[in-house]
């Protein structure tokens, strides 16, 4: 990677998240917007990426071909859909480009493809790039070690009506953080739906509840409930810019790293807390 500004490419440049990623890339010192990508046939192809994001003219035009931009970026930032991200991953692996992946909804094969690619390129892969959410994950680990053995643990998340996967990647990351602190595997203790005559709550499980409504950017709560008291740890996002800023910050952090799989805890050095 270059010693000068890190050049980033933004996938899905015309989407809500893509436009904010462009804004964040233009605002962060040490980062340069190198390329912007949209799907073939998009009416936005040829547009100036900065103008598209409401940030003024940049001279970077929106393209549809990875080959056309391969010399214009060092790190590829992708918040699209799993199938598209995996195609971009293969290209970046082939050409030695770093990646920041904020896409959610991968199946196990997709996650394994990311792990495999990290042998050759540097990747930051996180369910949520918000600083606050990642601090919350650390707090959940601490709370679970103290209270997890005797409380009922529930995770409640809410997002806008357009979100296509449930539970959210962040909710799953919360469950994984709690399960890991309790020396459990989430797949063995998660309860994702309750309907009809369910019987009493099974001790040691982690329940999930999902809300999809309106324009909610993202709200997540973990509840540790006992008889007589409960602890709730909540994060609420009011703007996607918090995710965009974290993603671009992650791209800058990848500077000088040749390979490896990282997450926001690495970027923020939370593992040493």
From Swiss-Prot:
GO terms for molecular function: 4-hydroxy-tetrahydrodipicolinate reductase; NAD binding; NADP binding; oxidoreductase activity, acting on CH or CH2 groups, NAD or NADP as acceptor. The active site is at 159 (proton donor/acceptor), 163 (proton donor). NAD(+) binds at residues 12-17, 38, 102-104, 126-129. Its main location: cytoplasm. (S)-2,3,4,5-tetrahydrodipicolinate binds at residues 160, 169-170. NADP(+) binds at residue 39. It catalyses: (S)-2,3,4,5-tetrahydrodipicolinate + NAD(+) + H2O = (2S,4S)-4-hydroxy-2,3,4,5-tetrahydrodipicolinate + NADH + H(+); (S)-2,3,4,5-tetrahydrodipicolinate + NADP(+) + H2O = (2S,4S)-4-hydroxy-2,3,4,5-tetrahydrodipicolinate + NADPH + H(+). Gene3D superfamilies: Dihydrodipicolinate Reductase, domain 2, NAD(P)-binding Rossmann-like Domain. Keywords: Amino-acid biosynthesis, Cytoplasm, Diaminopimelate biosynthesis, Lysine biosynthesis, NAD, NADP, Oxidoreductase. GO terms for biological process: diaminopimelate biosynthetic process; lysine biosynthetic process via diaminopimelate. Its EC number is 1.17.1.8. Belongs to the DapB family. HAMAP family: DapB. Catalyzes the conversion of 4-hydroxy-tetrahydrodipicolinate (HTPA) to tetrahydrodipicolinate. This is 4-hydroxy-tetrahydrodipicolinate reductase. It comes from Escherichia coli O157:H7. The lineage of its organism: Bacteria, Pseudomonadati, Pseudomonadota, Gammaproteobacteria, Enterobacterales.
